[in-house]
Structures are given as structure tokens and as C-alpha cells.
From Swiss-Prot:
The presence of a 'disulfide through disulfide knot' structurally defines this protein as a knottin. PROSITE patterns: HWTX_1. The keyword Signal applies. Expressed by the venom gland. Its main location: secreted. Residues 1-21 form the signal peptide. One of its GO terms (molecular function) is sodium channel regulator activity. The keyword Disulfide bond applies. It comes from Cyriopagopus hainanus (Chinese bird spider). This is Mu-theraphotoxin-Hhn2j 2. Keywords: Amidation, Disulfide bond, Ion channel impairing toxin, Knottin, Neurotoxin, Presynaptic neurotoxin, Secreted, Signal, Toxin, Voltage-gated sodium channel impairing toxin.
């Protein structure tokens, strides 16, 4: 029962992706689709002037992007949850 539900859901997702791909005329379709699904801009990291999640940083220099903070322990940018 679980396997058939999973296969049905996977089939619907595949149908959606194929339908969207057939209508898309851009060559950067996979990047565009992933960007829309995850609502993040990780593919254009070179364009921004700040460091994103997982990038190395120096604590106290404020190099990380908004909503990120430099970890004193690990020395990389992580998501700041406001604590």
C-alpha cells in the first residue's frame, strides 16, 4: 500500500516536471526549477557581495549574508535564528 502511494506520487511529480520542461524554452531549466522549488539563490553565489551558508568566514567581520552569522566555533556562515 505504501509503495503504491509512493509510486503514484512520484509519477505525478515526474508528470509535472516533464510538463513544465516541455513548456520551458530556456536552457537553464534545471537551475531555474531548483531555484523555484527551494526558493534560494545558491546558484548565483558569485554575484552577491556576502558569504552564504557553509562559506568560510572570520568571526566579527560581518561577511555573511543577511539572516546568517559567522560561527565562532566552526568559522563558517550558518543560519541565524535570532537567539
Amino acid at each position: 500500500m505504501k509503495a503504491s502511494m509512493f509510486l503514484a506520487l512520484a509519477g505525478l511529480v515526474l508528470l509535472f516536471v516533464v510538463g513544465y520542461a516541455s513548456e520551458s524554452e530556456e536552457k537553464e531549466f534545471p537551475i531555474e526549477l531548483l531555484s523555484k522549488i527551494f526558493a534560494v539563490d545558491v546558484f548565483k553565489g558569485e554575484d552577491r557581495g556576502c558569504k552564504g551558508f557553509g562559506d568560510s568566514c572570520t568571526p566579527g567581520k560581518n561577511e555573511c549574508c543577511p539572516n546568517h552569522a559567522c560561527s565562532n566555533k566552526h568559522k563558517w556562515c550558518k543560519v541565524y535564528l535570532g537567539k
